[in-house]
Curated annotation (Swiss-Prot):
Gene expressing this chain: 8
SMART domains, sorted: BID_2 (SM00635)
GO annotations of cellular component type: T=3 icosahedral viral capsid
Entry-linked InterPro entries: Big_2 (IPR003343)
Name assigned to this protein: Major capsid protein
Keywords: Capsid protein, Late protein, T=3 icosahedral capsid protein, Virion
Quaternary structure, from the entry: Homohexamer. Homopentamer. The prolate capsid is composed of pentamers and hexamers of the capsid protein.
Higher taxonomy: Viruses, Duplodnaviria, Heunggongvirae, Uroviricota, Caudoviricetes
Family of this protein: Belongs to the phi29likevirus major capsid protein family.
Annotated compartments: Virion
A Pfam family of this chain: Big_2
Predominant place of localization: virion
């Protein structure tokens, strides 16, 4: 990801080194223009002398170069981060993103008599909400010595090296770290058991295993894109679908070397060029056994909340200190489809149990049905055991997930759906939970919750 001066010129739309000086000069103060002449191929020393004439001119030049020009450059070359295309953009105000998903509603049977009684009954939409907090507040420090600035104007070649060194030291460092943070989102999501896991043989071991991986990847993509949607491939068990053009595959360089892109593109029913845009090659996953990841393009929730350069001069040390601040939201959407292809014998039979609704509000003396979605990797049915914590006498839950709240219940309840994938001697429970807030039943004068 190291930046060359050709990258700098391309991003600024210039062909010569001195064009950068002139770009700064065009928007500079009259004082700057008085001392710094229009630059050309022959007057590098004259330009340098004008910039170095006093601290005011020097400060204006460095501020424009490092802050304004530098940001233009880094925004252009940031696409070198192969994951940058998934960023959502800027969020200049606030530190929290609220993500809302409205799930489909349940079918109801027509009943003419019931219609007379329930015509004005409310049906609250099945709305689910997630919050993403700003979780990166970093800065990058770079010092520019007066002597370094003088040396930069010995020749235009020196000037090119000077600019490239600044960009690499400040902005490129931030870009590399952003790439590592975005990769970490993938590994953290996997370690929390939030991916739908598809178990595969190691595709690097044989041609047969590689072919089987392609088949499973194709089948998964097709299921994610079915018109009616599915609850099977996201961490909130909402019914959603992905457009095939929005399905992206992440693989490491070793697997990429073994894959026939044309075969894989055909498997996804895409032309080669389009498919290559949907395959992102990274240097590797940190999680053991994780071979590939397939996600909807909206899975990444990465926003820039602040990109700002601050500067201060140390007159005693004869240098300038620059501080480039980068604040971001680095997260992933649990509403979006996301699948991990994993190898090894340590893949658990069940990776996640999701209880829906995850949050419920139930009146005293009333009932609420819950559903458990079991994320299994062995294609088997697994028994779900329901329980409720925090309830008073009379509050219970049935074996099929129907919660009955006691008429005098005032506590907040926790509904649990448990799948045990262990043995009698060594149980390994996988638990999904829902929170239930109990409301008073005003029609019966129930106690206030």
């Amino acid at each position: 990801m190291r930046v060359t001066f050709n990258d700098v010129k391309t991003s600024l739309g210039v062909t010569e080194s001195y064009d950068i000086i002139n770009a700064i000069r065009n928007s500079a103060t009259d004082n700057f223009k008085t001392y710094v002449p229009l630059a050309n191929a022959e007057n590098v020393a004259e330009v340098g002398a004008g910039i170095l004439v006093n601290q005011t001119v020097q400060n204006e030049f460095l501020t424009s170069l490092v802050d304004r020009i530098g940001l233009v450059i880094v925004k252009s070359i940031s696409l070198r981060n192969p994951l940058a295309k998934f960023k959502k953009g800027a969020l200049p105000m606030g530190r929290t993103i609220e993500e809302i998903f409205t799930d489909i509603t349940k079918e109801k049977l027509y009943d003419a008599e019931e219609a007379e009684q329930k015509v004005f009954e409310r049906e609250i939409p099945n709305v689910k909400t997630l919050f993403h907090e700003r979780n990166r507040q970093s800065f990058y420090h770079q010092t520019i010595q007066d002597d370094s600035l003088k040396t930069a104007f010995i020749s235009w070649g020196n000037f090119e090296s000077f600019i490239a060194s600044i960009i690499n030291a400040i902005y490129n460092s931030a870009e590399v770290d952003e790439y590592e943070y975005m990769k970490l989102i993938i590994d953290n999501y996997y370690s929390k058991g939030l991916f739908k896991v598809v178990k595969v043989d190691d595709p690097m071991t044989s041609t047969g295993a590689l072919t089987n991986f392609i088949k499973k990847a194709r089948a998964t993509a097709l299921k994610m894109t079915l018109p009616q949607g599915t609850r099977d491939y996201n961490a909130m068990a909402v019914r959603t679908r992905s457009d095939i053009r929005d399905v992206h595959l992440f693989i490491d360089a070793d697997l990429n070397a073994e894959l026939d892109v044309d075969v894989l593109a055909k498997a996804f029913n895409m032309d080669r060029t389009t498919f290559l845009g949907n395959v992102t090659v990274i240097d590797g996953f940190a999680s053991t056994g994780l071979k590939a990841v397939m996600v909807d393009k909206d899975w990444f929730m990465v926003y820039d909340t602040l990109q700002k350069m601050e500067t201060i001069r140390n007159p005693r040390g004869l240098y300038w200190n620059y501080y480039y601040h980068v604040w971001q939201v680095l997260s992933a959407s649990r509403f979006a489809n996301a699948v991990a292809f994993v190898t090894g014998d340590d893949v658990p039979a069940v990776t996640q149990v999701i209880v829906s609704p995850a949050i419920a509000s139930v009146k005293q003396g009333k009932s609420q049905a819950f559903t458990a979605y079991v994320r299994a990797t062995d294609d088997k049915e697994h028994e779900v055991v329901w329980s409720v914590d925090g309830g008073s006498t009379g509050t219970s839950i049935s074996s099929d997930g129907v919660l009955t709240v006691a008429a005098n219940e005032t506590n907040q309840l926790t509904v649990k759906a448990t799948v045990d994938i262990g043995t009698a001697d060594e149980p390994k429970p996988v638990v999904g939970e829902a929170v239930v807030n109990v409301r008073p039943d005003s029609s019966t004068g129930g106690a206030q919750a």
